[in-house]
Amino acid sequence: MLKPPIGILGGTFDPIHIGHLRPAIEARDALGLAEVRLLPNHIPPHRASPFCSSEQRLAMVALAAAENPGFVVDERELKRDTPSWTIDTLIELRHELPDTPLCFLMGMDSLLGLPSWHRWQELLDYAHLVVSTRPGWQPDYPAEVAELLARHQSQQVADLHRLRHGRIWLADNLPVELSATRLRALLATGADPRYLLPPSVAQYIRQQGLYRPA
């Protein structure tokens, strides 16, 4: 008998904002996830180094998790001195949680770029992929991704509960068009970030003087 599935959401979280949290909340509720683990990256392999320190980003993620029932912080990637490869994290989690389906949460942009990920063909050997989509948007899938969807896409939530891994679920989320880059630019102007990130995170950013021009 398998345990209820859990969600895995990795990211730089520089800072964490509603573009990260809202799809994760919807996945938690729609898919019946027992918890959502937030994993801040230490060395993100696909983007520039973070603006804030690991300690500051971890503090913001912890504040965001405290405001959302079922959300917890997983620090394992911050403790590594190597790039934060998703496959390494999923392998570790699978060993720790052999009877728990793992649902790796990602955006559509990440799915479209999946063939550039380290050992991407192995991800479904350890987890399901839960992909946030935009209502009415028909993406132009690369051939490798289209083939992956043809073999692994599921139409039944129950599949994510009865199988440990191997399915892809396209989640029809409310659109949230916000990136950390745009948010940092807004914060640099001193504008009010209300409703764009959790109140406790906004307060922390103000107290620490983060994202202000040098």
Curated annotation (Swiss-Prot):
It is an enzyme of class 2 (transferase). Gene3D superfamilies: HUPs. Its EC number is 2.7.7.18. It comes from the Bacteria. GO terms for molecular function: ATP binding; nicotinate-nucleotide adenylyltransferase activity. InterPro entries: Cyt_trans-like (IPR004821), NadD/NMNAT (IPR005248), Rossmann-like_a/b/a_fold (IPR014729). Keywords: ATP-binding, NAD, Nucleotide-binding, Nucleotidyltransferase, Pyridine nucleotide biosynthesis, Transferase. Pathway: Cofactor biosynthesis; NAD(+) biosynthesis; deamido-NAD(+) from nicotinate D-ribonucleotide: step 1/1. It catalyses: nicotinate beta-D-ribonucleotide + ATP + H(+) = deamido-NAD(+) + diphosphate. One of its GO terms (biological process) is NAD biosynthetic process. Pfam families: CTP_transf_like. The keyword RNA-binding does not apply. Belongs to the NadD family. This is Probable nicotinate-nucleotide adenylyltransferase. It comes from Aeromonas hydrophila subsp. hydrophila (strain ATCC 7966 / DSM 30187 / BCRC 13018 / CCUG 14551 / JCM 1027 / KCTC 2358 / NCIMB 9240 / NCTC 8049).
